Amino acid sequence: AMPSVAQDTPLSMVLSPDSEWEKIASGMKFCDACCTDGEGNFYFADTGNNGPIRKVSHDGSVKEYGPSLYGVSGLQFGKDSRLYICQAKARRISVLKNGDSLETVIENVRPNDLVVTKNNQLYFIETSTQRVYHVNLNDKIKVLRIVDTGILKPNGIGLTPCDGTLFVSDHLDKEVWFFRIEKNHRLTMKAPYASLRIRAKNLPSRGDGCDVDSLNRYYVTSDLGIQMFDPTGRLGGIILSPDPLKPV
């Protein structure tokens, strides 16, 4: 068996060259905010219809999950299977417990995307203000804290499995920004660690949703498709969009 070494990994070691996109759901207006739970079930929002979140199980079945929601732009499971939800148009972050009980966590913000650490620390991006925020979910009274400013149009946020590194994609710029998460939950060591490939000079990267696998390979959706980077920030390859004229 091939050893589990991620550094300098070409895409062909992760995805077979003859792999093709498979349709798992249809009839949506605009899909956003995908995430998975601890069992590997896949969730996404049909933001264009403002309906319930959709859950895709291992057998490929697609079911509605929870109540109808307005303007969902980010999803992430936290502790105790709680699903945290960015609702930018509704100006709040909500939490869905057990798939039915919905509560507001933070109001009067315009969250685009979020992550939650294993010790209940929530980070989210607010694209319009170019900010990254932190909220300690363990506190009874939730306090907003600005932990970064200045990324041109922050659009996606990700977290490494060890909760030590946070990274943010930029819709306009090609740089993906990386931070170290300190013990006091602040962000330090900000650096443009990886660069997205763009369609042509001076065009936006359309960097969006981010994720990372167990070997710290980074995945960022973009204008060209899903771009994969190894732990050093080197591009391993691009999974092209199923529609070459549209971003992922």
Ranges and model annotations:
Residues N50-R54, R91-S94, Q130-Y133, K174-W177, ...:
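Structural signal for beta-propeller blades
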Residues F42-K63:
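Beta-propeller domains
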Residues E20-S26, G60-G66, D100-I106, K142-D148, ...:
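A short beta-strand motif characteristic of beta-propeller blades
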Residues S4-E20, V135, L187:
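Blade/loop signatures of beta-propeller domains
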Residues L137-N138, F179-R186, G233:
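Short loop/turn segments immediately following beta-strands, especially the blade-tip
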Residues T47-G48, A88, T127-S128, H171, ...:
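Short loop/turn segments immediately following the C-termini of beta-strands
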Residues S222-V248:
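C-terminal closing repeat unit and adjoining cap/tail of repeat-based domains
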Residues S26-E39, S68-Q87, R91-R92, E107-Y123, ...:
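Beta-rich, blade/repeat-based domains predominating
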